[in-house]
Curated annotation (Swiss-Prot):
UniProt cross-references to InterPro entries, sorted A to Z: MukE_C, MukE_N, Scp_MukE
Gene Ontology terms: cellular component: cytoplasm; nucleoid
Protein's name according to its UniProt entry: Chromosome partition protein MukE
Protein source organism: Haemophilus influenzae (strain ATCC 51907 / DSM 11121 / KW20 / Rd)
Acidic residues biased stretches: 233-243
């Protein structure tokens, strides 16, 4: 029988025994990003980052600390932890949130934005016709089509809120929120750019909604096509967790 000390280091044992671990573990497994706004959770991950990264690698995921300081789990193609996939519109909304995070308006408005501002900025930066077609291929640009697009944007913002990208301000349904630095999951391409704001705007205009992580996962999925599994089995494994 394997000695437990051969598997778990003393410091990892301390981390797992910490009362905060179950909550942090559940948040990470659900896809949540933990930023500096979450003081206790973030401090816990800072203290035990190396030990917990080794722990999660046994599930074929990595505990990542981004340059901006936030933590999240990045799955490999063979992950044992269920993952969900963002839609193209959700990723595009994420890029708009990153654009707003970089904008001068964030300071002018004390960092508070509204759902309507995200929608308006999306229409300002992206092609409205393409957005409407993404919601309904037969879109004629009617008011009903625009209403459906607005509903999809609100749903995307709600999804990103659950992932820790934004924090609600005031009542739950106020439509007001602050943007976390974790939106840089959608802005990794502009970290080294000369003008991050303009670079992000260009990415949105060009419809480049994929993130580096999503592109890596796509490449890994293509490599897995040579596996002995059938196409149906592959679809079930990699896409079955989509919300």
């Amino acid at each position: 029988m394997t000695d437990i000390q051969d598997v778990i280091s003393p410091k990892l044992a301390v981390a797992i025994a910490n009362p905060i671990f179950p909550a942090v573990d559940s948040l990470l497994r659900s896809g949540r990003h933990i930023s500096t706004e979450h003081l206790d959770n973030h401090a816990f991950l800072m203290d035990f980052q190396n030990e917990l990264d080794g722990f999660y690698r046994r599930y074929n995921v990595e505990l990542i600390r981004a340059p901006e300081g936030f933590f999240y789990l990045r799955p490999k193609a063979t992950t044992l932890i269920a993952r969900s996939v963002l839609s193209e519109l959700e990723m595009l909304v994420g890029k708009v949130l990153c654009y707003l995070y970089l904008s001068p308006e964030r300071l002018a408005q004390q960092g508070i934005f509204s759902t309507q501002e995200v929608y308006d900025e999306l229409l300002n930066l992206a092609d409205e016709g393409k957005l409407l077609k993404a919601v309904n291929q037969r879109s004629s640009g009617s008011d009903l089509d625009k209403q459906k697009l607005a509903e999809k944007v609100r749903a995307a913002i709600g999804r990103l809120r659950r992932l820790g990208m934004i924090q609600t301000v005031g009542e739950q349904n106020s439509g007001k929120f602050t943007i976390s630095e974790s939106v840089f999951r959608f802005g990794a391409e502009v970290r080294s750019g000369d003008d991050p704001l303009e670079s992000q705007a260009r990415l949105i205009r060009d419809g480049e909604a994929a993130t580096p992580d999503s592109l890596a996962l796509e490449k890994q999925a293509q490599l897995m096509e040579n596996d002995t599994k059938s196409a149906d089995e592959i679809d079930e494994e990699f896409d079955g967790e989509q919300e």
